[in-house]
Design a protein with these regions (language model features):
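Short S/T/G/P-rich N-terminal loop/turn motif that feeds into the first structured element of a domain
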Residues: 5-7, 12-96, 117-123
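Short arginine-rich
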Residues: 98-115
Length: 123
């Protein structure tokens, strides 16, 4: 009986671990933008919301003047964007709608985009 209980506990732990491993973690874009043509950049800004909303992302922070504690951080704007998963983040970034906006943004600014995996949130 004791062996059966131990075996059951081990199997349950393995299943729970597998389920947690399979769950996708949130993903975050950290974006640093230097705008060189405000008027042209306006077209990117105007189209961003409607394309972005289709993919369930959330803009967590936007700052024109972040507090630099170490190093150098030259940018007109710094943005942090959250998606529920890396796959959703990449689906948005690689979408036809957003890639059309990327071409506009690239003519009006220079930008650095990085994608970070978030930590798995406890259940």
């Amino acid at each position: 009986m004791r062996r059966l209980s131990l075996l059951t506990a081990v199997v349950v732990a393995m299943v729970v671990g597998a389920v947690l491993w399979a769950q996708e973690r949130p993903a975050y874009f950290l974006v640093k933008v230097t705008i060189t043509d405000q008027d042209a950049y306006g077209a990117y800004r105007d189209g961003f919301g409607s394309v972005f909303q289709q993919y369930g992302g959330e803009v967590l922070a936007v700052s024109a003047e972040p507090t630099v504690l170490e190093g150098e951080w030259e940018a007109t704007a710094t943005v942090i964007i959250r998606f529920d998963s890396r796959s959703e983040a990449l689906e948005w970034y690689n979408s036809d709608g957003y890639q059309e906006l990327v071409r506009i943004r690239q003519l009006a600014s220079s930008a650095d985009f990085i994608l970070l995996d978030g930590r798995q949130q406890p259940g």
